[in-house]
Amino acid sequence: MIAAPPMVSSTFVDLLRARAAAHPRRIVFPETADLRVRTAIETLARERIVDPVAILDPAAPETHSAVRALGVEVVDPTVEGALGRTVDMLLSARAKKGLSPEKAIEYGRHPLFFADGMVKRGDVDGCVSGCVYTTADVLRAAIWLIGPAHGVRTISSAFYMVTAPFRGDTAEVLTFTDCAVVQYPTAEQLADIAIAAATDRRRIVGDEPSVAMLSFSSVGSGSGSSVDLVRNAVSILRAKAPTLAVDGELQGDAALIPAVGNRKAPRSSVAGRANVLVFPSLDAGNIAYKLVERIARASAIGPIVQGLARPCSDLSRGASPDDIINVAAITALQAAQAGATEHQPSGRTET
């Protein structure tokens, strides 16, 4: 992530961390062999933003002393009792789909699967990983062990883009979705993605979502199968979430710039005011967030995974310690607002 000009992102990031620190949540980190993660854990613990839990990596024993020196709770995934619980969960979830006991033990020792087992059991409130493991790895473990939230059929992701002011005097915080998971969403999936993004925006940013379903067309200015897809998604979305402020199809400028929105979609309550941008494909979303990050020097916080039963966030593999801290704060807010079980800080122990 390229840093935004300090005044652009500092207010939102400071508020994000302060809100998380008000009710610290237990967040587990399975990638402690990476120095960036250990650095982030130190800051998170020192500033009491979250209550970190560190997983030892059996494949990197040379890092264990450094992990234990962090002064936070440390868990060894190879300890018999803890491993057995994770293996039982894996077999319960996947045995009918061909997972053997031997393979379940192998997965159970893996820090990522072990950490998500802790999330599923309620031992911790959320998991942050992805600066070492791929998005596919992170999602596989999360779907196997945590699973989707009740009634959710589409797991997706969002970035929170903090940009310089362009509609007033204050920095903008925009939700970009989906930028990391669903490659070619159907109309139903686009509607699910929009609902998940709107729900998380309320939890994380604390304002009311105004959702623009993006296209190369604005309310009939263009035609084609991709435009039809977005229009169908809007119809489905309005039926599923009738109180949500949503419109589409809208072009990017019509969604964001009041003067353009008034000209291209004069009857829209969303045009020119959107704060949630739903892209029609992973190509569009991923390209857009990277361009805005690099050219506009926006802060890109995420990707934040949406739609899981409990929070599990996926970092960029280029994440800095600050990125990890910010995603951990968002993960904690997801857990707090979703009503995850309260935990008291556990002290400095190892299991």
Stretches with model-predicted labels:
Residues 2-271, 276-351:
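Anion-binding alpha/beta catalytic cores of soluble intermediary-metabolism enzymes, centered on
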